[in-house]
Amino acid sequence: MPSFDFDIPRRSPQEIAKGMVAIPGGTFRMGGEDPDAFPEDGEGPVRTVRLSPFLIDRYAVSNRQFAAFVKATGYVTDAERYGWSFVFHAHVAPGTPVMDAVVPEAPWWVAVPGAYWKAPEGPGSSITDRPNHPVVHVSWNDAVAYATWAGKRLPTEAEWEMAARGGLDQARYPWGNELTPRGRHRCNIWQGTFPVHDTGEDGYTGTAPVNAFAPNGYGLYNVAGNVWEWCADWWSADWHATESPATRIDPRGPETGTARVTKGGSFLCHESYCNRYRVAARTCNTPDSSAAHTGFRCAADPL
Protein backbone atom coordinates (compact mmCIF):
# COMPACT_ATOMS: atom_id res chain seq x y z
CA MET A 1 0.00 0.00 0.00
CA PRO A 2 1.24 3.54 -0.69
CA SER A 3 2.35 5.77 2.18
CA PHE A 4 1.24 9.37 2.56
CA ASP A 5 2.84 12.52 3.88
CA PHE A 6 -0.34 14.15 5.13
CA ASP A 7 -2.08 13.99 8.48
CA ILE A 8 -5.09 11.72 8.69
CA PRO A 9 -7.85 13.51 10.61
CA ARG A 10 -9.81 11.78 13.32
CA ARG A 11 -13.40 11.35 12.20
CA SER A 12 -16.45 10.22 14.11
CA PRO A 13 -18.33 7.14 12.93
CA GLN A 14 -21.23 9.40 12.00
CA GLU A 15 -18.99 11.58 9.83
CA ILE A 16 -17.49 8.58 8.05
CA ALA A 17 -20.88 6.96 7.44
CA LYS A 18 -22.47 10.10 6.01
CA GLY A 19 -23.43 9.49 2.40
CA MET A 20 -22.78 5.76 2.66
CA VAL A 21 -25.15 2.81 2.30
CA ALA A 22 -25.08 -0.17 4.67
CA ILE A 23 -24.89 -3.43 2.72
CA PRO A 24 -25.99 -6.45 4.77
CA GLY A 25 -23.72 -9.42 5.00
CA GLY A 26 -24.66 -12.66 3.34
CA THR A 27 -24.17 -14.59 0.14
CA PHE A 28 -24.62 -13.63 -3.49
CA ARG A 29 -23.75 -15.11 -6.84
CA MET A 30 -20.74 -13.28 -8.22
CA GLY A 31 -19.39 -13.24 -11.75
CA GLY A 32 -21.09 -14.15 -14.97
CA GLU A 33 -21.03 -16.39 -18.02
CA ASP A 34 -22.38 -13.90 -20.54
CA PRO A 35 -21.72 -14.94 -24.16
CA ASP A 36 -20.89 -11.30 -24.94
CA ALA A 37 -18.13 -11.17 -22.33
CA PHE A 38 -14.43 -11.04 -23.15
CA PRO A 39 -12.92 -14.45 -22.22
CA GLU A 40 -9.64 -12.86 -21.17
CA ASP A 41 -11.45 -10.80 -18.52
CA GLY A 42 -12.26 -13.83 -16.38
CA GLU A 43 -15.82 -12.89 -15.45
CA GLY A 44 -16.65 -16.50 -14.66
CA PRO A 45 -17.26 -18.85 -13.19
CA VAL A 46 -20.47 -17.85 -11.45
CA ARG A 47 -19.73 -18.61 -7.81
CA THR A 48 -21.43 -18.15 -4.46
CA VAL A 49 -19.52 -15.67 -2.31
CA ARG A 50 -20.14 -14.81 1.33
CA LEU A 51 -19.41 -11.28 2.54
CA SER A 52 -19.42 -9.60 5.92
CA PRO A 53 -21.53 -6.43 6.26
CA PHE A 54 -19.92 -3.25 4.92
CA LEU A 55 -20.64 0.35 3.97
CA ILE A 56 -20.20 1.82 0.51
CA ASP A 57 -20.58 5.32 -0.88
CA ARG A 58 -23.94 6.08 -2.42
CA TYR A 59 -22.17 8.12 -5.11
CA ALA A 60 -18.79 8.14 -6.79
CA VAL A 61 -16.40 10.67 -5.25
CA SER A 62 -17.10 14.06 -6.82
CA ASN A 63 -14.84 16.88 -7.96
CA ARG A 64 -16.05 18.91 -4.99
CA GLN A 65 -15.10 16.19 -2.52
CA PHE A 66 -11.70 15.58 -4.08
CA ALA A 67 -11.01 19.33 -4.12
CA ALA A 68 -11.65 19.44 -0.36
CA PHE A 69 -9.14 16.62 0.11
CA VAL A 70 -6.48 18.39 -1.96
CA LYS A 71 -7.10 21.69 -0.16
CA ALA A 72 -6.72 20.01 3.23
CA THR A 73 -3.62 17.96 2.41
CA GLY A 74 -1.83 19.53 -0.56
CA TYR A 75 -1.94 16.12 -2.23
CA VAL A 76 -0.47 15.88 -5.73
CA THR A 77 -1.92 13.21 -8.02
CA ASP A 78 0.04 10.80 -10.16
CA ALA A 79 -1.17 12.59 -13.31
CA GLU A 80 0.28 15.86 -11.98
CA ARG A 81 3.57 14.21 -11.09
CA TYR A 82 3.88 12.62 -14.52
CA GLY A 83 2.73 15.81 -16.22
CA TRP A 84 0.08 14.22 -18.45
CA SER A 85 -2.93 11.93 -18.58
CA PHE A 86 -5.13 10.24 -21.19
CA VAL A 87 -8.06 12.17 -22.70
CA PHE A 88 -10.62 10.90 -25.22
CA HIS A 89 -9.69 12.33 -28.62
CA ALA A 90 -13.02 14.08 -29.28
CA HIS A 91 -12.77 15.98 -25.99
CA VAL A 92 -9.35 17.49 -26.71
CA ALA A 93 -9.68 21.14 -27.73
CA PRO A 94 -8.27 22.03 -31.18
CA GLY A 95 -4.68 23.22 -30.94
CA THR A 96 -4.03 21.47 -27.62
CA PRO A 97 -0.46 20.05 -27.58
CA VAL A 98 -0.43 16.26 -27.36
CA MET A 99 2.25 13.65 -26.82
CA ASP A 100 3.27 10.81 -29.11
CA ALA A 101 2.27 8.21 -26.52
CA VAL A 102 -0.65 6.17 -27.85
CA VAL A 103 -2.48 2.98 -26.97
CA PRO A 104 -2.27 0.92 -30.20
CA GLU A 105 -5.44 -1.05 -29.50
CA ALA A 106 -7.31 2.13 -28.48
CA PRO A 107 -6.07 5.02 -30.67
CA TRP A 108 -8.91 7.26 -29.50
CA TRP A 109 -6.93 7.91 -26.32
CA VAL A 110 -4.63 10.94 -26.51
CA ALA A 111 -1.85 11.67 -24.02
CA VAL A 112 -2.38 15.32 -23.10
CA PRO A 113 0.28 17.27 -21.16
CA GLY A 114 -1.30 19.13 -18.27
CA ALA A 115 -4.46 17.01 -18.12
CA TYR A 116 -5.33 16.17 -14.52
CA TRP A 117 -8.35 16.08 -12.22
CA LYS A 118 -8.80 19.86 -12.16
CA ALA A 119 -8.24 20.28 -15.93
CA PRO A 120 -9.75 17.07 -17.30
CA GLU A 121 -9.43 17.96 -20.99
CA GLY A 122 -6.02 19.58 -20.59
CA PRO A 123 -4.81 23.18 -20.14
CA GLY A 124 -7.64 25.66 -20.39
CA SER A 125 -10.32 23.19 -19.29
CA SER A 126 -11.95 23.38 -15.89
CA ILE A 127 -14.29 21.60 -13.48
CA THR A 128 -15.90 24.87 -12.36
CA ASP A 129 -19.19 23.94 -14.01
CA ARG A 130 -19.14 20.30 -12.86
CA PRO A 131 -18.45 20.17 -9.11
CA ASN A 132 -20.93 17.30 -8.75
CA HIS A 133 -19.42 15.19 -11.52
CA PRO A 134 -17.13 12.28 -10.58
CA VAL A 135 -13.49 13.17 -10.18
CA VAL A 136 -11.40 11.64 -12.99
CA HIS A 137 -7.70 11.39 -13.86
CA VAL A 138 -7.20 9.72 -10.49
CA SER A 139 -4.99 6.65 -10.20
CA TRP A 140 -5.51 3.76 -7.80
CA ASN A 141 -2.83 5.35 -5.62
CA ASP A 142 -4.77 8.63 -5.61
CA ALA A 143 -8.01 6.85 -4.75
CA VAL A 144 -6.38 5.07 -1.81
CA ALA A 145 -4.97 8.39 -0.59
CA TYR A 146 -8.39 10.04 -0.61
CA ALA A 147 -10.05 7.04 1.03
CA THR A 148 -7.43 6.96 3.79
CA TRP A 149 -7.92 10.69 4.48
CA ALA A 150 -11.70 10.18 4.58
CA GLY A 151 -11.41 7.33 7.10
CA LYS A 152 -12.49 4.81 4.50
CA ARG A 153 -10.96 2.36 2.01
CA LEU A 154 -11.59 1.08 -1.48
CA PRO A 155 -14.16 -1.68 -1.86
CA THR A 156 -13.03 -5.15 -2.76
CA GLU A 157 -14.23 -6.35 -6.14
CA ALA A 158 -16.69 -8.68 -4.40
CA GLU A 159 -18.06 -5.86 -2.24
CA TRP A 160 -18.38 -3.57 -5.25
CA GLU A 161 -20.23 -6.21 -7.27
CA MET A 162 -22.55 -7.22 -4.44
CA ALA A 163 -23.47 -3.57 -3.87
CA ALA A 164 -23.86 -2.88 -7.59
CA ARG A 165 -26.26 -5.79 -8.00
CA GLY A 166 -28.67 -4.06 -5.63
CA GLY A 167 -30.09 -7.30 -4.31
CA LEU A 168 -30.81 -8.78 -7.75
CA ASP A 169 -29.54 -12.28 -8.50
CA GLN A 170 -27.42 -12.52 -11.65
CA ALA A 171 -29.15 -9.66 -13.45
CA ARG A 172 -27.15 -8.26 -16.37
CA TYR A 173 -27.38 -4.67 -15.13
CA PRO A 174 -27.86 -3.08 -11.70
CA TRP A 175 -31.58 -2.59 -12.47
CA GLY A 176 -32.40 -5.81 -14.36
CA ASN A 177 -31.78 -7.49 -17.69
CA GLU A 178 -32.96 -4.81 -20.13
CA LEU A 179 -30.57 -2.00 -21.01
CA THR A 180 -33.34 0.58 -21.49
CA PRO A 181 -36.46 -0.69 -19.69
CA ARG A 182 -39.61 0.94 -21.08
CA GLY A 183 -37.34 2.98 -23.32
CA ARG A 184 -35.68 4.81 -20.42
CA HIS A 185 -31.94 5.25 -20.18
CA ARG A 186 -30.59 4.05 -16.84
CA CYS A 187 -26.90 4.84 -17.29
CA ASN A 188 -24.41 7.07 -19.07
CA ILE A 189 -22.80 5.10 -21.90
CA TRP A 190 -22.04 5.73 -25.58
CA GLN A 191 -24.89 5.91 -28.09
CA GLY A 192 -24.16 6.17 -31.79
CA THR A 193 -21.08 5.03 -33.67
CA PHE A 194 -18.01 4.48 -31.51
CA PRO A 195 -15.58 6.25 -31.46
CA VAL A 196 -16.65 8.93 -33.93
CA HIS A 197 -20.14 10.07 -32.92
CA ASP A 198 -21.94 9.95 -29.59
CA THR A 199 -25.56 11.03 -30.03
CA GLY A 200 -25.91 11.70 -26.31
CA GLU A 201 -29.37 10.13 -26.21
CA ASP A 202 -28.94 9.46 -22.50
CA GLY A 203 -28.36 13.18 -21.92
CA TYR A 204 -24.56 13.18 -21.76
CA THR A 205 -21.54 12.95 -24.06
CA GLY A 206 -19.02 13.09 -21.23
CA THR A 207 -19.35 12.46 -17.52
CA ALA A 208 -22.71 12.90 -15.81
CA PRO A 209 -23.37 14.17 -12.27
CA VAL A 210 -22.83 11.53 -9.62
CA ASN A 211 -26.56 11.54 -8.81
CA ALA A 212 -27.76 11.21 -12.41
CA PHE A 213 -30.23 8.44 -13.32
CA ALA A 214 -32.18 6.27 -10.92
CA PRO A 215 -30.39 4.33 -8.16
CA ASN A 216 -30.27 0.56 -7.88
CA GLY A 217 -32.07 -1.50 -5.26
CA TYR A 218 -29.54 -0.61 -2.57
CA GLY A 219 -29.68 3.11 -3.38
CA LEU A 220 -26.36 3.32 -5.27
CA TYR A 221 -26.04 5.65 -8.23
CA ASN A 222 -24.10 5.16 -11.45
CA VAL A 223 -22.66 1.71 -10.83
CA ALA A 224 -23.03 1.16 -14.58
CA GLY A 225 -21.40 3.57 -17.00
CA ASN A 226 -20.26 7.14 -16.27
CA VAL A 227 -16.78 6.31 -14.91
CA TRP A 228 -14.81 3.17 -14.19
CA GLU A 229 -14.31 2.66 -10.46
CA TRP A 230 -11.15 1.38 -8.80
CA CYS A 231 -11.38 -1.64 -6.50
CA ALA A 232 -8.87 -2.73 -3.87
CA ASP A 233 -7.94 -6.06 -5.48
CA TRP A 234 -4.96 -6.97 -7.54
CA TRP A 235 -6.09 -8.20 -10.95
CA SER A 236 -6.15 -11.82 -12.05
CA ALA A 237 -8.23 -13.46 -14.76
CA ASP A 238 -8.33 -16.81 -12.97
CA TRP A 239 -7.43 -16.49 -9.26
CA HIS A 240 -11.11 -16.65 -8.32
CA ALA A 241 -11.74 -19.80 -10.40
CA THR A 242 -10.27 -21.97 -7.64
CA GLU A 243 -12.74 -23.09 -4.97
CA SER A 244 -11.27 -22.15 -1.57
CA PRO A 245 -12.17 -20.10 1.51
CA ALA A 246 -9.96 -17.27 0.23
CA THR A 247 -11.96 -16.98 -2.99
CA ARG A 248 -15.43 -17.56 -1.52
CA ILE A 249 -15.46 -15.88 1.92
CA ASP A 250 -14.70 -12.14 1.99
CA PRO A 251 -12.34 -12.50 -1.01
CA ARG A 252 -9.69 -9.82 -1.38
CA GLY A 253 -8.01 -10.95 -4.57
CA PRO A 254 -4.47 -12.22 -5.15
CA GLU A 255 -1.70 -11.23 -2.77
CA THR A 256 0.39 -9.69 -5.56
CA GLY A 257 -0.05 -8.39 -9.07
CA THR A 258 0.78 -5.64 -11.53
CA ALA A 259 -2.67 -4.10 -12.10
CA ARG A 260 -5.74 -3.31 -10.01
CA VAL A 261 -9.35 -4.16 -10.78
CA THR A 262 -11.78 -1.57 -12.13
CA LYS A 263 -15.53 -2.12 -12.42
CA GLY A 264 -18.65 -0.55 -13.86
CA GLY A 265 -17.74 0.69 -17.32
CA SER A 266 -17.83 4.33 -18.41
CA PHE A 267 -19.43 6.91 -20.67
CA LEU A 268 -17.23 5.53 -23.45
CA CYS A 269 -18.59 1.98 -23.30
CA HIS A 270 -20.55 0.82 -26.36
CA GLU A 271 -21.88 -2.61 -27.25
CA SER A 272 -19.76 -2.67 -30.42
CA TYR A 273 -16.49 -2.31 -28.53
CA CYS A 274 -16.69 -2.36 -24.73
CA ASN A 275 -19.85 -3.77 -23.23
CA ARG A 276 -18.36 -3.80 -19.76
CA TYR A 277 -21.19 -1.79 -18.21
CA ARG A 278 -22.63 -5.17 -17.20
CA VAL A 279 -22.40 -5.86 -13.45
CA ALA A 280 -20.16 -8.92 -13.80
CA ALA A 281 -17.79 -7.20 -16.22
CA ARG A 282 -14.30 -6.29 -15.09
CA THR A 283 -11.03 -4.94 -16.36
CA CYS A 284 -7.86 -3.46 -14.87
CA ASN A 285 -5.14 -0.85 -15.04
CA THR A 286 -1.79 -0.26 -13.37
CA PRO A 287 -1.99 1.49 -9.99
CA ASP A 288 -0.35 4.70 -11.21
CA SER A 289 -2.46 5.04 -14.38
CA SER A 290 -5.12 7.70 -14.86
CA ALA A 291 -7.57 8.67 -17.58
CA ALA A 292 -10.62 10.83 -18.22
CA HIS A 293 -13.04 7.95 -17.66
CA THR A 294 -11.81 6.54 -14.35
CA GLY A 295 -12.85 7.50 -10.82
CA PHE A 296 -13.83 5.67 -7.63
CA ARG A 297 -16.14 5.35 -4.66
CA CYS A 298 -15.18 4.34 -1.13
CA ALA A 299 -16.18 1.59 1.27
CA ALA A 300 -15.81 1.15 5.02
CA ASP A 301 -16.23 -1.51 7.66
CA PRO A 302 -19.31 -1.24 9.91
CA LEU A 303 -18.81 1.51 12.47
Curated annotation (Swiss-Prot):
Cofactor note (record): The catalytic copper is required to activate oxygen and catalyze oxidative C-H activation.
Enzyme class name: oxidoreductase
Entry annotated with the keyword Acetylation: no
InterPro entries associated with the record: CTDL_fold, Sulfatase_Mod_Factor_Kinase, SUMF_dom, SUMF_sf
Pathway assigned in UniProt: Protein modification; sulfatase oxidation
EC number: 1.8.3.7
Alphabetical keyword list: Calcium, Copper, Metal-binding, Oxidoreductase
Positions contributing to Ca(2+) 2 binding: 222-223, 225, 227
Catalysed transformations (reactions): L-cysteinyl-[sulfatase] + 2 a thiol + O2 = an organic disulfide + 3-oxo-L-alanyl-[sulfatase] + hydrogen sulfide + H2O + H(+)
Binding site for Cu(+): 269, 274
Binding site for Ca(2+) 1: 188-189, 202, 204
A family per Pfam: FGE-sulfatase
Function: Oxidase that catalyzes the conversion of cysteine to 3-oxoalanine on target proteins. 3-oxoalanine modification, which is also named formylglycine (fGly), occurs in the maturation of arylsulfatases and some alkaline phosphatases that use the hydrated form of 3-oxoalanine as a catalytic nucleophile.
Protein name listed in UniProt: Formylglycine-generating enzyme
Organism of origin: Thermomonospora curvata (strain ATCC 19995 / DSM 43183 / JCM 3096 / KCTC 9072 / NBRC 15933 / NCIMB 10081 / Henssen B9)
Source taxonomy: Bacteria, Bacillati, Actinomycetota, Actinomycetes, Streptosporangiales
